[in-house]
Amino acid sequence: MSQAPMATTPRNYPIFTVRWLALHTLGIPTVFFLGALAAMQFIRR
């Protein structure tokens, strides 16, 4: 991901904001769900 030349133009910040929003709305519940599944493996007796 060579995005260094694109960072010089100040018009690209909504694109990065939407990408950040999409990655975190999908990524944070996924990591939380995988952590919950991993925790359930240790809780099971």
Curated annotation (Swiss-Prot):
> Keyword Transmembrane on this protein?
yes
Q: Which GO terms describe its molecular function?
A: electron transfer activity; heme binding; iron ion binding
GO terms of biological process kind: photosynthetic electron transport chain
What are the annotated GO cellular component locations? photosystem II reaction center; plasma membrane-derived thylakoid membrane
The UniProt entry, under InterPro entries, shows: PSII_cyt_b559_bsu, PSII_cyt_b559_CS, PSII_cyt_b559_N
What keywords does the record list, in alphabetical order?
Electron transport, Heme, Iron, Membrane, Metal-binding, Photosynthesis, Photosystem II, Thylakoid, Transmembrane, Transmembrane helix, Transport
Cofactor(s) required for function per UniProt: heme b
Q: Which domain of life is it from?
A: Bacteria
Topology of the protein relative to the lipid bilayer: Single-pass membrane protein
| Transmembrane region(s) | 20-36
Q: How is the cofactor bound?
A: With its partner (PsbE) binds heme. PSII binds additional chlorophylls, carotenoids and specific lipids.
Q: Where does heme bind?
A: 24
Compartments annotated for it: namely: Cellular thylakoid membrane
Principal subcellular localization = membrane
Known Pfam families for this protein? Cytochrom_B559
Described function: This b-type cytochrome is tightly associated with the reaction center of photosystem II (PSII). PSII is a light-driven water:plastoquinone oxidoreductase that uses light energy to abstract electrons from H(2)O, generating O(2) and a proton gradient subsequently used for ATP formation. It consists of a core antenna complex that captures photons, and an electron transfer chain that converts photonic excitation into a charge separation.
Report the family membership.
Answer: Belongs to the PsbE/PsbF family.
On assembly, the entry states: Heterodimer of an alpha subunit and a beta subunit. PSII is composed of 1 copy each of membrane proteins PsbA, PsbB, PsbC, PsbD, PsbE, PsbF, PsbH, PsbI, PsbJ, PsbK, PsbL, PsbM, PsbT, PsbX, PsbY, PsbZ, Psb30/Ycf12, peripheral proteins PsbO, CyanoQ (PsbQ), PsbU, PsbV and a large number of cofactors. It forms dimeric complexes.
Protein name in the entry: Cytochrome b559 subunit beta
Gene name, per UniProt, is psbF
